Amino acid sequence: MANKMKTRKSAKKRYSFTVNGKVKYKKQNLRHILTKKSSKRKRNLRKSGNLSCFEVKRIKTLLPYD
């Protein structure tokens, strides 16, 4: 009997899949030390990011059952 692949929990916390199969993630640098960052920069950091098609393949190997 073959072993099941394990899900990488660190990747599961950081990435999620959209309905179309794209990978979504939350941008960094919005936790603390926000006073020196401009409002425009903070507003852009609130948007979710999308990975390129090359990185999607790597993330799908880390998250086999999602």
From Swiss-Prot:
GO BP annotations, alphabetical order: translation
Annotated coiled-coil segments of the chain: none
GO terms for MF: structural constituent of ribosome
InterPro entries: Ribosomal_bL35 (IPR001706), Ribosomal_bL35-like (IPR021137), Ribosomal_bL35_CS (IPR018265), Ribosomal_bL35_sf (IPR037229)
GO cellular component: cytosolic large ribosomal subunit
Record keywords, A-Z: Ribonucleoprotein, Ribosomal protein
SUPFAM superfamilies, alphabetized: L35p-like
Pfam families: Ribosomal_L35p (PF01632)
Domain of life (superkingdom): Bacteria
Annotated signal sequence range: none
NCBIfam families cross-referenced by the UniProt entry: rpmI_bact
Family label: Belongs to the bacterial ribosomal protein bL35 family.
Name of the featured protein: Large ribosomal subunit protein bL35
Biological classification of the source: Bacteria, Pseudomonadati, Spirochaetota, Spirochaetia, Spirochaetales
